[in-house]
Amino acid sequence: MAVVFQKPKALTDVPLHYCPGCPHGIIHRLVAEAIDELGIEGKTIGVAPVGCAVMAYDYFACDMIEAAHGRAPATATGIKRCRPDNIVFTYQGDGDLASIGMAETVHAAARNENITIIFVNNAIYGMTGGQMAPTSLPGQVTQTSPYGRDVKHCGWPIKVCEMLSTLEGPEYITRVAVNNVKNVKNAKKAIKKAFQNQIEGKGFSLVEVVSACPTNWGMTPQKALEWVESDMLPYYPIGVYKDRSAAKEEK
């Protein structure tokens, strides 16, 4: 009998703690499948964030380290520079990467550190109960913006891919989503490419994954996916924002 689907070897047997309908499980699987297919499980080191994915070290069957809040890119930089033959990735949410960790993210990209960053953007602080994040949309209701995000007082959401793509340093900056089958497949390709770039020594790769948070958005999983399509993706368009290798090939 042909096997059409199975759990990736790069995932452990530990049950995921995420809320019902949370896409973190899908994204974990895509990362693990990329690790499996590239044959790098034995030399991969992951860096877990502070946030909903804080226990990622329980789920990935590779060496993992826990970073201080927002400091995953700096931690990954240290690991990669000390152990350049290892494949190093971070897995971070918007409350970690785009707020307290913004400096580490920007400067790792500017230096073109040869690391891979998986950035999950669900426009809210999930672990702490649904506060406004740097990526929360204008007018979005959260625990700390009960009348909706007012850009006059709170500023505009930060578009990480657009910002990082203006830097000279990074190799690959892309935004994907996991709200339907087509987007999941494309997300897998992007994540695998980000790891492949590191294997080839090309430098900094960041894959932003537009995700959902049904619990803190106050929606059913189905409604949350619909909201990703109707509200999140118009503000955070999927696509490749920088790919230096592709640009060179076109020339």
Which residue ranges define each predicted feature?
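Active-site-proximal loop->helix
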Residues: M102-H107, M127-V141
